[in-house]
Amino acid sequence: IMPSLVGSEMCIRDRGYPFFDLRNQEGFVRTLMIRTASTGDLMVVLVFFHEDVERREALLSHLAERFPEITSLMYVINGKCNDTITDQEVLVFKGKDHIIEEMEGLQFKVGPKSFYQTNSEQAYNLYKVAREFAGLTGNEMVYDLYTGTGTIANFVSRQAKKVIGIEYVPEAIEDAKVNSALNHIENTLFYAGDMKDILTQDFINQHGRPDVIITDPPRAGMHDDVINTILFAEPERIVYVSCNPATQARDLSLLSVKYSVKKVRPVDMFPHTHHVET
């Protein structure tokens, strides 16, 4: 189905719908986002530059009829200069407003704005490595930084005493809470907001010092304030998951005043590319 969906570009062209021109800020169809899950769920999100009910419904109806495998068909009207949709309303045309991913009997709700690794099979391997490196016995307080939809937090929760997850995107945190409830997990807490504003010394004093910190920041790495708070917290172990070796090396250098690297394991999340998670 993936090549066919990508081939839907021809359908758009045949209908004479203009693609969005970023430089001139004109056109109609901006982007087509596809998310798949190991459960068979399939999400498609079409982003338009402006509303045109007749054209929009014709295109969405075509996708719904041509690809009945789609379980979540949604759209966004984004009239901004940039392509980000995190601050835009996502509307459901057909099906659910999410897909379900599954691993080790746990189910994870993933919405259109929620971060989740694109390679489900390798994501499972990555999370197993993170759990192994965390060395949990069931008695630890764990902080999961940049938790996304709470996948790692919920994944390790059965081996921890308590897990606190922090994430910038509010919708992702709502999904994280739903994921805990969905799996009857009661030892997790989640907070939404800028990491440097939430993870403070006061936060540590209020919630307790973490025995283990698992951090999976974006490509930009961690803010200096976040690193300083981690150094203040002095967890026994830090598991650093990164998609950018350069910023990871920078952050590890800053953490080296109190910590040293004991293990490194790369995970090939994007086969046949130069990208790797470590």
Annotate each PLM feature.
Residues 16-22:
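Active-site phosphate-binding and catalytic loops of NTP-dependent enzymes
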Residues 52-58:
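Short, conserved charged micro-motifs
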Residues 27-29, 39, 275:
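Short Gly/Ser/Thr- and Asp/Glu-enriched loop/turn motifs at secondary-structure junctions
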Residues 22-23, 29-31, 266-269:
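Short, solvent-exposed loop/turn elements at beta->coil junctions and helix N-caps
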Residues 1-7, 12:
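Single conserved hydrophobic/aromatic residue that forms the stacking wall/gate
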Residues 31-33, 100:
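Short, surface-exposed charged micro-motifs
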Residues 34, 40-49, 107-111:
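Short, aliphatic-rich beta-strand segments
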Residues 55, 63-65, 69-278:
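Rossmann-like S-adenosyl-L-methionine
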